[in-house]
Amino acid sequence: MKIIFTEDVRGKGRRGEIKELPDGYANFLIKQNKAKQANAQAMSQLKGQKRAEARKEAEELEEAKKFKELLESGERVVEMKAKAGTDGRLFGSITSKQISQELEKQYGMKIDKRKMELREPIRTMGYVNVPVKLHNEVTAKIRVHISEK
């Protein structure tokens, strides 16, 4: 029997996948609401869902690209002040959370701190490029300037 998975079933199929399974197992999955029979109506509904998902994904990608342009346009530099020693090393460090808060304060742009790909907190003064993963395919760079208080 041909079925369409409505949920992921480990070892058998993923949500939205169409597969041919033995009748007994297919009926079991249908009763569990993990699959439905692949008739013409269900197939067209699945195609519609896939088109909607593709459209939504394209919109998210476009939005991420626009946000990247907005972040990198002009000379946007996040200015931060911190206490530092004589050799230019900071007392403490600058984290992605602080950068996110400062970006929102200065430019009104909200970025989740988890999207910033700082390998380790910033401990030196000067300019630093911080990569931000906005989407699977889109990565922007925020320029951060750390100066002494």
From Swiss-Prot:
Pfam families: Ribosomal_L9_C (PF03948), Ribosomal_L9_N (PF01281)
Gene Ontology MF annotations: rRNA binding; structural constituent of ribosome
Name of the gene: rplI
Span of the signal peptide: none
Protein keywords: Ribonucleoprotein, Ribosomal protein, RNA-binding, rRNA-binding
Family statement: Belongs to the bacterial ribosomal protein bL9 family.
UniProt-listed InterPro entries: Ribosomal_bL9, Ribosomal_bL9/RNase_H1_N, Ribosomal_bL9_bac/chp, Ribosomal_bL9_C, Ribosomal_bL9_C_sf, Ribosomal_bL9_N, Ribosomal_bL9_N_sf
Biological role stated in the UniProt entry: Binds to the 23S rRNA.
Magnesium among keywords: no
GO cellular component: ribonucleoprotein complex; ribosome
Protein name: Large ribosomal subunit protein bL9
Highest taxon of source: Bacteria
UniProt-listed GO biological process terms: translation
